[in-house]
Amino acid sequence: MGKERIDIEYPLTTKSFSLVWEQISSAHGLERWIANRVSDEDGVFTFTWGELWTQQDIRSAQLLEYVKNDHIRLKWEEDEDEDAYWEMSITRSDLTGYLTLHIVDFAWPEEKEDLKALWDGNLERLHRASGL
């Protein structure tokens, strides 16, 4: 049995696709809310958690899909589950005009709640950093 898909939706307080897109698709934007440092070189995003003088966790993700102002899909390089990836996409509410950030990720059944909590924390940092 493989990892299970998790779908999460976060309503945002903006109507600007470009503002949200910058936060979810660029190394600079991701660095504001996902990790301490993020770099992008030839479609490989490297995420570093921790500071230089402490223990660090470094993971890399390969860019699989990129559709501007729509979605970005990445796959952790060390993930052996062929079907697993993580994706962030933006949609607009027909009712309010505000945007929603959709997260798709994959986790083992016993780790789904922990992964959801991790994304909740990431989105709290996004809100604090950008007001979204």
Predicted feature locations:
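Generic structural detector for well-ordered beta-strands
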Residues: 9-13, 62, 89
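A short, structured loop/turn motif at beta-sheet edges
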Residues: 17, 64-69, 90-99
